[in-house]
Amino acid sequence: VSAAGDRLQDTARRAALALPDVSHGYPFTPGLDVYKVAGKVFLIVTDDPDEQIITVKCEPEHACAQERAYASITPGRYLDKRHWISLGPGPGITERLVTDAVEDSYDLVAERLPRRDRPSAR
């Protein structure tokens, strides 16, 4: 079952808030809900009914594979297009895929933090 835009965003928000030591807010613009771990961004949810996307960090080789596999996964909006991908509603974009993308992004960011700043194990 494909995740519609609002469900995609709600799923991403729920997945992010279930992770340890996550904060979120609107530091850039009122339309971008930004999720961070230890002050580092791992998820951006676009609050725009005409462009219901999420943007997550991704290993470059995995990002390329995802972009080839799904038409609604594109290089990351707003950020380094090599290390970030944006997911929009479309065929194959399931709640499980969204949750996995958010969790993978969190893990990528958390593992690069100095040991003292890393969240407790999840």
PLM feature spans:
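Charge-dense, helix-prone N-terminal extensions
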Residues: V1-R122
